[in-house]
């Protein structure tokens, strides 16, 4: 395999991908940066732990998996509405049972 000498390289490129600096972002020889999230792969172990994480459990760092804040806000508002209506229905049902129980006690006591 033919390998050009270092003098034939542009001064920007050393031939070592760890130290090459690309002339443009789209250059395929773009410098490989170490310890940059989403650019280097994380070492995964069989139990989904990763080597460079301080946490015990592997955390998926993919930004596409993050929750959309607007969807989350709308979901929380909907849950609040549902919980409020459920609470009102529960209180109404409980009060109806209490009134029926009081009427039953009154009916039984007046019958004697």
From Swiss-Prot:
The modification Phosphoserine is found at residues 51, 53. It is found in: Golgi apparatus membrane; Endoplasmic reticulum membrane. It is a single-pass membrane protein. Signal peptide: none annotated. Coiled coil: none annotated. The chain crosses the membrane at residues 90-110. Keywords: Endoplasmic reticulum, Golgi apparatus, Membrane, Phosphoprotein, Transmembrane, Transmembrane helix. One of its GO terms (cellular component) is endoplasmic reticulum membrane. Its main location: Golgi. The keyword Metal-binding does not apply. This is Uncharacterized protein C1795.12c.
